[in-house]
Amino acid sequence: MSGPADAEPVFAEQLGSDDPLERAQAALDLALYYLDRGFAPAGKTRAFLKARDIVGEIGSEDLRSRVAAGTLTDLAGIGPSTGSVISDAVDRRPSRYLADLASATVQDVGSGGGIRSLLRGDLHSHTFWSDGSESVATMARSARALGHEYLAVTDHSARLTVAHGLDEARLSEQLTEIEALNAELAPFRILTGMEVDILEDGRLDLSSEMLSRLDVVVASVHSKLAMDEREMTRRMVMAVADPDVDVLGHCTGRKITGRGRPPSRFDADIVFAACARFDTAVEINCRPERRDPPEELTALALEWGCRVSIDTDAHAPGQLEWQAWGCGFAADMGIDPERIINTYPADELLGWTAAHPTA
């Protein structure tokens, strides 16, 4: 990934459309991109999502008439901010709101510019197949606009019902969709994948037959986070020892924003020794509320010789830019880029995922 990140190519065609409705929707999408990039409060994001739905319902001529008459904000659900973005797009004016939002949400790579230039993709992302906010196609096009060569789509497995996790039938449908999109987007590649739940006994929430069909498997703990340290250690080791698992996701499960959540307790030496033994990468999760693992555990994973993956865990296109933090963190930790698996070209990466040792 080289050069500055730029979201606008994803929306450029619609922003330049002759149809005022398409321009308005693209401008709202761009606002949502920046809001997601800036980890905006959910209420703000919902306001723009609602405005996008409202605009889609009223049609081009009604929209143009309301903007001309200054009555756009008379519509329930259209406020001053959303109204200004829509009106500027309809009238083909530069949007001060979008410009300010873009400036305020730039992601600082810090000392990680060198690592960022070497990254070729992101191995942890979600779409509306589970709890993401956008389609596979939109996430992929956004990743491509950021300079990525590939994006792994890793929606949740069925056990995580709160996130509308995929059972095997729905996952098979998604694989068919990805196959068609790859034909359209080549040479960019959407890698098939899943963030599979590590069950309480260490088993994975997907059959080995289905796991073997996937390009990238991220295994994560989402339940019983406060279980006994010894049992959690056993649970995690069983998962990373599975040759179908490529990445151990957000290993402590901590949350560091809002009400927060303490990290799970496990014997990190044993878990990271297993990651090194079975060549399973430890994820550096870039989500602002996670940023997991912390420095001391990252250092320990490196001491054990683990590979790492710098991933956003993005649930929306703008969140794909959160890799900037992870690159800075990796640089500050002195991580050799050769140990970062998403610096590998796609074919080399897939060769690695297919070659994990067995017990």
Where do the protein language model's features map onto the residues?
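Short conserved micro-motifs on helix faces and helix-strand junctions that flank
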Residues: A76-G77, G121, A152, I310
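Ser/Thr-glycine-rich phosphate-binding loops at phosphate-binding pockets of nucleotides
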Residues: L123-F128, Y150-T154
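Long, highly charged, low-complexity intrinsically disordered interaction regions
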Residues: S2-G112
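Charged catalytic cores and adjacent phosphate/nucleic-acid-binding surfaces used
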Residues: S2-P20, T73, S84, S95-L119, ...
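Short beta-strand elements
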Residues: I190-T192
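Core AdoMet radical
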Residues: A152-V153, M194-V196
